[in-house]
A protein has these predicted regions:
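Glycine-rich phosphate/adenylate-binding loop and adjacent beta-alpha elements
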Residues: 1-32
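Short helix-loop-beta connector
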Residues: 38-40, 62-68, 136-137
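Adenosine-nucleotide cofactor-binding segment
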Residues: 71-74, 86-154, 174
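C-terminal hydrophobic helical "lid"/dimerization subdomain
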Residues: 141, 153-157, 199-251
């Protein structure tokens, strides 16, 4: 089952295993779920690569009721993380970002406290602010969803003793991060990297979405739609940070 759900290059036979394709090959034992009519295609566009990843990450991290979750980055992954953390019982959800529309959407998805990058402009200031908001404790679970190695040390320093640093954003091979490993050891902290998840995580994520359809604005996560011939513009505008999640509409 693990092999069935693992990434395989589209260069390998039978090739139809990548995005933006007309066909997709399902290997033996590949898990599939039938969507209820209440969940639209638009709402599920980010379920596989975003929503279920943060669901699985918070589940594996062992988030407990009343704990504090810190979310770095309020893009698609970040706003999903806010709702999942809230539904898993987080007592406080702190979001770090600097774009108004992203901060507002995060609020609609359950975030209650914000660290604005335009106000807290240095790593030291942001770490200090998170500590102030948590009685000098830090986040019990801290999610890195930005995808830049320069934030790794900063996120670790705002992770509480016996807390979990959840790394989902840094997917670029070859990039390096520098941090003090003693911070992990003396605080009994742990680092979890996550890209893949089990079928039960997808089931749980879909169930959560279904039961909270009127609580969170799931339809707003896909903020921009592009025809297939404008796919390059979609990527360019996504990189600017003002597109929460882009959808490519086939002809």
């Amino acid at each position: 089952m693990r092999q069935a759900n693992w990434l395989v290059s589209c260069e390998q036979w039978p090739h139809f295993q990548g995005g933006f394709g007309q066909y997709f090959y399902l290997r033996p034992n590949h898990a599939m779920f039938v969507l209820p009519p209440e969940i639209t295609d638009e709402m599920t566009a980010g379920v596989n690569c975003a929503y279920t990843q943060v669901y699985a990450g918070l589940d594996i991290a062992g988030l407990k009721a009343g704990q504090t979750v810190v979310v770095q980055g309020a893009g698609g992954l970040g706003v999903y993380a806010c709702a999942v953390a809230r539904e898993m019982g987080a007592g406080r959800v702190i979001v770090i970002d600097g774009i108004d529309e992203r901060l507002e959407l995060a609020r609609q998805f359950g975030a209650d406290t914000f660290v604005d990058l335009r106000e807290f402009t240095t790593p030291e200031a942001r770490v200090k602010r998170v500590k102030e908001l948590t009685d000098n404790w830090g986040g019990d679970v801290v999610l890195e969803l930005v995808g830049h190695p320069g934030v790794v040390d900063e996120r670790l320093r705002m992770t509480a003793p016996e807390g979990t640093y959840l790394e989902i954003g840094n997917i670029n091979v070859g990039w390096k991060a520098e941090f003090d490993p003693s911070w992990i050891i003396f605080g009994n902290r742990r680092i979890i990297g996550l890209a893949h998840y089990e079928a039960e995580h997808l089931r749980g994520a879909l169930d959560l979405m279904l039961r909270t359809l009127t609580k969170y604005p799931w339809r707003k996560v896909v903020s921009h739609k592009y025809p297939l011939e404008e796919i390059n513009r979609a990527f360019a505008e996504q990189d600017k940070g003002h597109v929460t999640r882009a959808a490519i509409m086939p002809n």
